[in-house]
Amino acid sequence: MAFHSTSNDTIFALSSAAGRAGVAVVRVSGDRAGDVIDVLSARRPKARVAVLRKLVDPQTGGLIDHGLVLWFPGPASFTGEDLAELQVHGGRAVAAALLRVLGRVEGCRLAEPGEFSMRAFENGKIDLSQAEGLADLIDAETETQRVQALRQAGGVLFRLTERWRAKLIEAMGLVEAAIDFSDEVDVAEGAVGQAEERVRELGDEIGSHLNDDHRGEILRDGFQVVLAGAPNVGKSS
């Protein structure tokens, strides 16, 4: 996804599901996240400590809601940036009022879809496979999907590919050694032979991983099933 605004902007978004609920969670990420807390609730709390505060519209002085305020200074946050989390009552009007006020804060804008995860990736907090795992976890509808998504979000695929990368680097080092000691035939041939063995083992391992009949995709996407039969035999029920 291409984001049209610069990553220097401070972004905000409703992180909980849209609609009526008990609690609405709004996140703010960027250089001005701490200023947002100061503007709405007079002062920011201690890092990673939830406090109950009045949230006030700085333009009118009117009360938006009472809610929990959390402050996560970067880089120790999901995005790696300064991050604020505001938890308010989950009525549509409350969430809309809070988002409206945040939109008036200079330097702040509504986040585009996936932008929080994109910033986490850009700042080295997650890799692409973990970002995909988080998306799958949010979309999971079955227990099997949940377990698979948690494994990927937890870095299982990342650690596997890092191990493959280490083996490739080792093989490359052996080839470079063979080049450096090309005048010593025994050393060069031995290094090349070891490199070939490493690459062959790695190819077999990658092939075995890929040759799984797309089980992971099937678990994630589910099955398409056709119910066929004569009319009025119970297909609908």
Mark where each language-model region is:
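A glycine-rich (often HGG/GG-containing) alpha/beta subdomain
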Residues: M1-V147, R151, G155
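Long, non-coiled-coil amphipathic alpha-helical linker/lever segments
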Residues: K125-H209
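Conserved G1/Walker A P-loop phosphate-binding module
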Residues: R20, A24-S29, V39-R43, E176-S237
